[in-house]
UniProtKB/Swiss-Prot annotation:
GO biological process: intracellular protein transmembrane transport; protein import; protein targeting; protein transport by the Sec complex
Record-listed ATP binding positions: Q99, G117, E118, G119, K120, T121, D631
Organism listed in the record: Chlamydia abortus (strain DSM 27085 / S26/3)
UniProt catalytic activity: ATP + H2O + cellular proteinSide 1 = ADP + phosphate + cellular proteinSide 2
Highest taxon of source: Bacteria
Function of the protein: Part of the Sec protein translocase complex. Interacts with the SecYEG preprotein conducting channel. Has a central role in coupling the hydrolysis of ATP to the transfer of proteins into and across the cell membrane, serving as an ATP-driven molecular motor driving the stepwise translocation of polypeptide chains across the membrane.
Main location: membrane
Bilayer disposition of the protein: Peripheral membrane protein
Record field: transmembrane: none
Xref: InterPro entries: Helicase_ATP-bd, Helicase_C-like, P-loop_NTPase, SecA, SecA_CS, SecA_DEAD, SecA_motor_DEAD, SecA_preprotein_X-link_dom
UniProt name for this protein: Protein translocase subunit SecA
Catalytic activity, EC: 7.4.2.8
Similarity comment: family membership: Belongs to the SecA family.
Cell location: Cell inner membrane; Cytoplasm
Gene it is expressed from: secA
Length: 969
């Protein structure tokens, strides 16, 4: 029925394209009408359109005319020189109808999927121009600084011709110039720069003048799938150095290395014993039918199954798995031990290992033997694996009648410190093991200049300045014997998911989005529209070639390169990691094939390498870096011989990455071809291929070196990729559910902080905080049942200790109700506060004269105190939330939903945060001290007021130094 309706009415995509095509026709009609106008008259259209918007006309109504203005300008500029990134070129672009259609979709809030070379950059100019007419902030978000700079210089010239201002925001943009950049009508920049400025404005800036942003109205995200999906789980973090080194990594690094080496030796021994037993059978196409022989082979395969749980990448294991029947036996043991009825036997077998490595879920677990080895041989402690039950420990202390109250407090402090030490040690141990077992050099990171540099798993690009969180970076530094740097302290953080949801309107463009359309809709409420190509794509997509082993695969790849290279086609070989790119480069050198390598280690030459990759006979080996944001332009000779030939050395876990690699060839009507080579040892095949595929391998086992190629295999691979994508989507959605809790708290705190920065009535905010604290303390101390009893002296004692306030106990007793008492205390505190600051204003005026705005000085002091304590308490809260997030997963043991528990406890933490902020502010305000310093100044110099905070931990005193230009000594 659904198929019938689609045939009758057309699909949703077809209906949308048809509707937008009507607007395209209107744009072309306006374009013809604008042709007779002079350049000056066309420029004046911008002011006219702005006026019409201010008078109430909607952007949707103005769209056809505004887009026609941009199109007409592009036509008029044809042949004029434009400088882009230091290169001189002539303008030669006028938007095609499909580009206008894509531009309409972006304004309507769609993600437009446009193929490589179809002109996404020019397409974006039209919605940028239209939305900039509002005068509100309009941003174009790119994946790197180079593209931001290029696009601003290149297509930004259209906007500047029309009288709009453009700015570019890159990592080197000085802070003092950023405010001017944000004032531009259209700003180009990277996601991280926009995000970090948002965090700086809300966590570091202490005045309106220091804040650079002006809001979030409309953004177009280039390569939107990379930013909103691949980078979604990577938070933007502003941090500073921690107070001290965590000594755990120094203490444990050698011990952990020894334990991992023991595991390696054990697995190597098991693997070699199995190899000796299976030596005779490795070269047999068909195993013997003898029952006893099969049983013996099966036992050796059982040992190799155990090796797969301790060292998944063991060389002997990989060699044996090349044989389809032996591979099937190992997999059979895996199925056997996963069965519920064999769980005890599985536990007993796995207990032979020191560590169980779960490659599928990227996790590991220490066995009892591993823990014992840690204690006996590695010099560890059994306490490293036992966390303290603080409730039980505190109950024991409280129940010990031999201890005095002071001794009980000291004992609890000691217990708490011991618990903190154990947790830090256990966390450090786990991160060191993770670094050794799950993080691979030249895959997850590279070592450069005594530093660990992260490699982006999706783009293959190095990420200098980024650090793995939660101590993992320090653990890798310890593993690689580079300088272990201090752990950083987080000042502010936000995920890209929640940052981009700040915009009123959001759109995107990419060449690969349709496979993730469900996620875009559910998380960002963005629909994907596939825009038709201007010219038919001439790419030839060959079926994947499957080989049994990695060795056979690389041999076939080299043969393919040699064959194509002989014809002269430029070749781009895509690899999944730095390690693989360097391995393939060695093989090509051995075969004397000239080539260029592009990976995270030489990314600085990217533009130069890509510029040469389309020349006749060029061979380029690249990681995923070459898959996005780069157009490989062919020279004329390369077009004649058939264009760029793309070779994929494996399938990525995401179909989008494969599509990006294919999309490097056959751009804008050029010829080209693409082919992927796979082996059954590839990670995707090993971990996610279906049992059905393994059965087919055994049945169709080809001779050595011969490929298997069939559309059916392609389908099975796509199924495996969909399975991985679904899992990753679930993880991202799960992460967002937790971050949404944090996001609501972040927005509340940032709103409060901005109120403090911008408020003209800062005294009113301070009095509000004082009132809250007084009401809270009175409510906590004074007994609700007997408000006139013994609790009033305790309230008086606390007030005398915390504030210079003498309470009239007799008067409070006459008030009877706790609410009335709390209100009276609040009123008394506010009166003391007002008198204190009135006195300070008078002293400043007497000391500095009328030239100093004494009232303004006091307001600035109050503002500074409030901001300081908001920031300090927020930093502590971020640490508490991280700890809660890491611990809450254990609640599943008690049959509790971790997310519900997280929401509940984070709410309690947030209530505590608000309370602590108010108490800290109020205590500090009442402990301010004024120190007057007079210095001789020239008569014309305006007095300078400097403030410094001392003893912040004790909330004071704050020293206010007034430097006067008075002649008095």
């Amino acid at each position: 029925m659904l198929d019938f309706l689609k045939r009758f009415f057309g699909s949703s995509q077809e209906r949308t394209l048809k509707k937008f095509q009507k607007l395209v026709d209107k744009v072309n009609l306006y374009d013809e009408m604008l042709a007779p106008l002079s350049d000056e008259e066309l420029r004046n259209k911008t002011a006219e359109l702005k006026k019409r918007y201010q008078d109430g006309e909607s952007l949707d109504d103005m769209l056809p005319e505004a887009y026609a203005v941009v199109k007409n300008v592009c036509r008029r500029l044809t042949g004029t020189p434009v400088e882009v990134s230091g290169y001189h070129q002539n303008w030669d672009m006028v938007p095609y109808d499909v580009q206008v259609l894509g531009a309409i979709a972006m304004h309507k809030g769609f993600i437009t999927e446009m193929q490589t070379g179809e002109g996404k950059t020019l397409t974006a100019v039209m919605p940028l121009y239209l939305n900039a007419l509002t005068g509100k902030p309009v941003h174009l978000v790119t994946v790197n600084d180079y593209l931001a700079q290029r696009d601003c210089e290149w297509v930004g010239s259209i906007l500047r011709w029309l009288g709009l201002t453009t700015g570019v925001l890159i990592s080197g943009s000085p802070l003092e110039k950023r405010k001017d950049i944000y004032r531009c009508d259209v700003v180009y920049g990277t996601a991280s720069e926009f995000g970090f400025d948002y965090l700086r404005d809300n966590s570091i800036a202490t005045s309106v003048d220091e804040q650079v942003g002006r809001g979030f109205y409309f953004a177009i995200i280039d390569e939107v799938d990379s930013i909103l999906i691949d980078e979604a789980r990577t938070p933007l973090i502003i941090s500073g150095p921690g107070e001290k080194h965590n000594p755990v990594y120094f203490e444990l690094k050698d011990k952990v290395a020894d334990l991992v080496q023991l595991q390696r030796e054990l697995c190597n021994q098991l693997a070699l014993e199995a190899r000796r037993g299976l030596e005779l059978f490795l070269d047999m196409d068909i195993l013997p039918k003898d029952k006893k022989v099969i049983e013996a082979i099966s036992e050796f395969c059982r040992s190799l199954w155990l090796v797969s749980k301790g060292m998944p990448l063991n060389r002997v294991l990989r060699r044996v798995r090349e044989h389809p029947d032996l591979r099937a036996m190992i997999d059979k043991w895996d199925t056997y031990y996963h069965a519920e009825q064999n769980k005890e036997e599985s536990i007993e077998k796995l207990s032979q290992l020191y560590i169980i490595v779960d490659e599928h879920n990227n996790d590991f677990e220490l066995t009892d033997r591993g823990m014992q080895q840690w204690v006996d041989k590695a010099g560890g402690s059994a306490e490293d694996f036992v966390m303290m039950d603080m409730g039980h420990e505190y109950a024991l202390i409280d129940g010990d009648d031999t201890l005095s109250p002071t001794e009980k407090i000291n004992r609890k402090i000691a217990i708490s410190e011991e618990d903190t030490r154990r947790k830090a040690r256990a966390h450090g141990l786990r991160q060191l093991l993770r670094a050794h077992l799950l993080m691979e050099r030249d895959v997850d990171y590279i070592v450069r200049n005594d530093q660990i540099v992260i490699i982006d798993e999706h783009t293959g690009r190095p990420q200098p300045g980024r650090r793995f969180s939660e101590g993992l970076h320090q653990a890798i530094e310890a593993k690689e014997h580079v300088t272990i740097r201090k752990e950083s302290q987080t000042f502010a953080t936000v995920t890209l998911q929640n940052f981009f949801r700040l915009y009123e309107k959001l759109a995107g463009m990419t060449g690969t989005a349709i496979t993730e359309s469900k996620e875009f809709k559910e998380i960002y409420n963005l629909y994907v529209l596939q825009v038709p190509t201007f010219k038919e794509c001439l790419r030839v997509d060959h079926n994947d070639e499957f080989y049994m082993t990695e060795r056979e695969k690389y041999h076939a790849i080299v043969k393919e390169i040699a064959r194509i290279h002989a014809v002269g086609n430029p070749i781009l070989i895509g690899t999944e990691s730095v390690e693989v790119s360097e391995k393939l480069s060695r093989i090509l050198r051995q075969n004397r094939i000239e080539h260029t390598v592009l990976n995270a280690k030489n990314h600085a030459q990217e533009a130069e390498i890509i510029a040469a990759a389309g020349k006749l006979g060029a061979v380029t080996v690249a990681t995923n870096m070459a898959g996005r944001g780069t157009d490989i332009k062919l020279d004329e000779e390369a077009v004649v011989v058939g264009g760029l030939h793309v070779i994929g050395t494996s399938r990525h876990q995401s179909r989008r990455i494969d599509r990006q690699l294919r999309g490097r060839c056959a751009r804008l009507g050029d010829p080209g071809s693409a082919k992927f080579f796979l082996s059954f040892e590839d990670r995707l095949m090993r971990l996610f291929a279906s049992p059905k595929l393994n059965a087919l391998i055994r049945h169709f086992r080809p001779p050595e070196g011969e490929a298997m190629s069939d559309p059916m295999f392609n389908k099975l691979i796509e199924t495996a990729q969909k399975r991985v994508e679904a899992r990753n989507y679930t993880i991202r959605k799960h992460t967002l559910e937790y971050d949404d809790v944090m996001n609501r708290q972040r927005q509340t705190i940032y709103a409060f902080r901005n109120d403090v920065i911008r408020s003209e009535d800062i005294f009113g905010l301070a009095k509000e905080a004082i009132s809250h604290v007084a009401l809270m303390i009175a409510s906590l101390i004074v007994s609700r049942d007997h408000p006139t009893g013994n609790s009033l002296p305790r309230l008086e004692e606390w007030m005398n200790y915390s504030f210079p306030l003498q309470l009239n106990i007799e008067e409070l007793k006459r008030l009877k109700s706790i609410d009335a008492i709390a209100e009276r205390v609040a009123d008394d505190l506010i009166e003391v506060f007002q008198n204190k600051f009135a006195s300070m204003v008078q002293e400043i005026t007497e000391a500095a004269g009328e030239k100093v705005d004494a009232n303004g000085v006091c307001k600035d002091v109050i503002r500074s105190v409030m901001i300081m304590h908001i920031d300090e308490q927020w930093k502590i809260h971020l640490v508490d939330m991280d700890l809660l997030r890491s611990e809450v997963g254990l609640r599943t043991v008690g049959q509790k939903d971790p997310l519900i528990e997280f929401k509940h406890e984070s709410f309690l933490l947030f209530e505590s945060l608000i309370r602590d902020i108010r108490i800290a502010i109020v205590k500090h305000l009442f402990r301010l001290e004024l120190t007057m310093t007079r210095e001789q100044r020239p008569q014309n110099v305006v007095p300078v007021v400097a403030t410094s905070f001392q003893n912040n931990e004790n909330f004071g005193p704050l020293e206010l130094t007034v430097i006067s230009d008075s002649d008095d000594e």
